Amino acid sequence: MNRPESIYDLLLAPLTLSLIFGGIGVVLLTNIIYSALSLGLVLICISFFYIILNADFVAVAQILIYIGAVNILILFAVMLMNNPKYPNYAPPWTVGDSISSIVCTSLFCSLITIILNISWFGISLTQKSDQMLERDLTNNIQRIGAHLSTDFFLPFELISIILLVALIGAITIARREETV
């Protein structure tokens, strides 16, 4: 998607000023919430720079990953840690902790066993037929989608499992009631 040069000139100055003021806000604001919101402004400005450079997928990934995940995670962590109802001491080891440890260890061992027993040679043979399919794809987003569903399927699924575990952990922490 090509844009006329005059659009670049109109967008460059306000984006640059927003980026500079947002960066100054990240460093100089004393309230951590305002600082995190200022970081969100900086990341949005960077994604607009990617759009100007015709890197649409990178811009969307910037918004989803850095603003939608990392910045929100920072805000949640700050809000949870500033809550006075959660004490700073660690609770003793409980039965639920040992059950969770056993389940996590068994899942880890089964994943390692599956990874070691997969025939990786057969997967590399399917990549040659995928290269023929890749020539028919027209834009970068379609090519990245094809790579995520073929070449990088295992890391993509592992990341989704890690995000699911992080989400469950955040919900558990948020729902925990004071037991003192």
UniProtKB/Swiss-Prot annotation:
It comes from the Eukaryota. The chain crosses the membrane at residues 10-30, 32-52, 57-77, 102-122, 153-173. It is a multi-pass membrane protein. The keyword Oxidoreductase does not apply. Keywords: Chloroplast, Membrane, NAD, NADP, Plastid, Plastoquinone, Quinone, Thylakoid, Translocase, Transmembrane, Transmembrane helix, Transport. GO terms for cellular component: chloroplast thylakoid membrane. GO terms for molecular function: NADH dehydrogenase (ubiquinone) activity; quinone binding. It is found in: Plastid, Chloroplast thylakoid membrane. InterPro entries: NAD(P)H-Q_Oxidoreduct_6 (IPR050290), NADH_UbQ/plastoQ_OxRdtase_su6 (IPR001457), Nuo/plastoQ_OxRdtase_6_NuoJ (IPR042106). Disulfide bonds: none annotated. It catalyses: a plastoquinone + NADH + (n+1) H(+)(in) = a plastoquinol + NAD(+) + n H(+)(out); a plastoquinone + NADPH + (n+1) H(+)(in) = a plastoquinol + NADP(+) + n H(+)(out). Its EC number is 7.1.1.-. Its main location: plastid. NDH is composed of at least 16 different subunits, 5 of which are encoded in the nucleus. Belongs to the complex I subunit 6 family. NDH shuttles electrons from NAD(P)H:plastoquinone, via FMN and iron-sulfur (Fe-S) centers, to quinones in the photosynthetic chain and possibly in a chloroplast respiratory chain. The immediate electron acceptor for the enzyme in this species is believed to be plastoquinone. Couples the redox reaction to proton translocation, and thus conserves the redox energy in a proton gradient. This is NAD(P)H-quinone oxidoreductase subunit 6, chloroplastic.
